[in-house]
């Protein structure tokens, strides 16, 4: 028994306490995790997709949104049934066997490597708005490697409440910026004939180009894998899960289709070609906002995006 005046030692954490601490992520945190990759895909894929899909770019992104909905529902169901880390590899093991699980794991790993490489190089293209040499040569490589190193370090440190809050704030700011670009772009440039006029199905674009463009739009869906890998650390009831699925899907449709419409109207397809596919390939969103007017607005948004 403790002597009078002495503080009692803190009680050892019970299994229930540990469980509460561990299962601490809610729907806002998961939305932030999912949206970081989805939002980044607009910044690097818009130019490639527009260069291949041309006037069908909005429809390609709409199809990507439908595919995201189906994929997201699959992940939500799988994560609810099997609350283990590793996402699709766990689902594949339960549904099929260890071999299929192994193949799925390596495919996801390769997808992550591709996404990291593309995102880090694209980031340098946007940073070049502040300092042009960052967009090419050795400076670009050095900055890209530094970004990869920072991401690796952040993932080694793991999640914390502060990091989750910071990520959520960044996601909200990014959503606001993208909605602002969409709103201004639609007011300044929207014209349905500008989108449909250059479309000649089978030739401009070709069906193979449309399929390739659609494949590019799905690269960032690995964010679902990231969120699914945290399924054992979340506190989501049916209502919270429904809110997460609805908000993520609504955001994808609005941002993807909205940005695609603004892209092909602000930088229209001419003679089966768009500047988004070459001149603005590395930083397509900057290519869009520099077309805005007045010039002061374009200059401001150039640095904001």
Task: Please provide the spans of the model-predicted regions.
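Extracellular loop-to-transmembrane helix junctions
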Residues: 21-22, 44-147, 248-258, 301-302
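TM-loop-TM module centered on a large, flexible mid-protein loop between adjacent transmembrane helices
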Residues: 91, 97, 129, 133, ...
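Membrane-interface loop-to-helix entry segments
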Residues: 139-190, 204-205, 245-249, 253
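Membrane-interface "cap" regions at the ends of multi-pass membrane proteins
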Residues: 1-56, 69-75, 84-85, 195-204, ...
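Juxtamembrane interface elements at the cytosolic ends of transmembrane helices
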Residues: 2-13, 43-46, 72-79, 154, ...
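Membrane-water interface regions at transmembrane-helix termini and the short interhelical loops
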Residues: 78-80, 103, 125-134, 147-173, ...
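Membrane-interface helix termini and inter-helical loops of multi-pass transporters
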Residues: 125-133, 191-202
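Hydrophobic, membrane-embedded alpha-helices of multi-pass small-molecule transporters
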Residues: 25-42, 147-150, 184-187, 200-254, ...
């Amino acid at each position: 028994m403790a002597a009078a005046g002495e503080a009692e030692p803190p009680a050892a954490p019970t299994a229930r306490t540990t469980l509460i601490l561990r299962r601490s992520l809610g729907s806002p945190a998961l939305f932030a995790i999912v949206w970081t990759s989805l939002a980044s895909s607009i910044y690097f894929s818009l130019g490639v997709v527009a260069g291949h899909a041309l006037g069908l770019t909005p429809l390609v992104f709409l199809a990507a949104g439908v595919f995201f909905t189906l994929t997201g529902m699959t992940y939500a169901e799988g994560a609810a049934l099997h609350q283990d880390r590793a996402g699709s590899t766990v689902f594949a093991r339960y549904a099929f066997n260890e071999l299929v699980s192994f193949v799925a794991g390596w495919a996801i790993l390769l997808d992550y490597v591709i996404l990291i490489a593309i995102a880090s190089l694209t980031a340098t293209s946007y940073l070049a708005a502040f300092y042009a040499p960052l967009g090419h040569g050795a400076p670009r490589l050095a900055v890209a490697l530094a970004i990869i190193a920072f991401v690796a370090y952040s993932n080694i440190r793991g999640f914390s409440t502060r990091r989750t809050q910071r990520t959520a704030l960044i996601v909200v700011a990014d959503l606001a910026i993208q909605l602002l670009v969409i709103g201004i772009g639609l007011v300044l440039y929207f014209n349905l004939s500008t989108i449909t006029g250059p479309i000649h199905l089978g030739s401009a674009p070709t069906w193979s180009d449309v399929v390739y463009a659609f494949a590019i739009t799905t690269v960032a869906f690995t964010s679902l894998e990231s969120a699914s890998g945290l399924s054992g650390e979340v506190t989501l009831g049916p209502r919270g899960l429904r809110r997460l699925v609805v908000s993520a899907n609504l955001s994808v449709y609005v941002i993807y289709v909205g940005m695609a419409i603004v892209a092909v109207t602000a930088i229209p397809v001419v003679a089966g070609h768009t500047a988004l596919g070459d001149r603005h390939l590395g930083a397509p969103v900057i290519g869009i906002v520099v077309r805005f007017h007045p010039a002061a607005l374009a200059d401001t948004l150039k640095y904001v995006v």
